[in-house]
Amino acid sequence: MSINSYADNRPGFVCGQFNKNIIEVPGEYVFPFAEYEGYSYFDPRFIENKKGCEANFRVLPMRMSWSDLKPSNEVSNDVKIIEVYAEPLKGNPEKYLSYRKYVYLDMGYLKRKGELYYDEELDLYFTEVTVTIRRSIGHKDDMYFNKKGYYWKEINNEVIFLIECEWLPIDEKYHKCFQYFLIPEIGTKVKFYFDAKELSNSNIMREKIRIFLLDHVKN
């Protein structure tokens, strides 16, 4: 039996709950598999976890093509893929992303934050954060610099969504990003990964993913 098919689900669908909201999606979207509350994936008792529409999701991972949001596990230069991870939202949704921004940008003494800019084209705030890491190679110490770029949107001093992009030193450009956003009405936080070249489309991606999940709420 497939890990994505359970006795209390419709055949070919994956079902579970986020904060008492039942979500059911076609199994072709789910990659590699949904995790439910209970034992960790690394625990042999993982297979004993309650599954299906009455169980709580720990994470619902999905892969889909852009821009039609069709299920896709294909690895090809001709197919643009976005990876989506939906998890239960815990705590106050009004402060969640503001705190997440603080953690990414300010927490930790090894971080060096760049100047704050406002990107007029994207209509987003932007700054860079560099973490200096000392590495021992043989008998020598080497300094490694890990740089990431952050974009975010604020309304009434609250962060609405947050984007992190990884810097690729060898190419001297950002190459992969993820965006965090919330869907409070179904008690869900969402992270999705996309190519940095699609940054200008990330607002459309977020809205399409939000609608996709809301459309798959099971009444």
Features from the language model and the residues they span:
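Long, compositionally biased interface segments
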Residues: 166-219
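Short, Gly/Ser/Thr-enriched beta-strand-loop segments that form substrate-interacting elements
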Residues: 146-147, 152-175
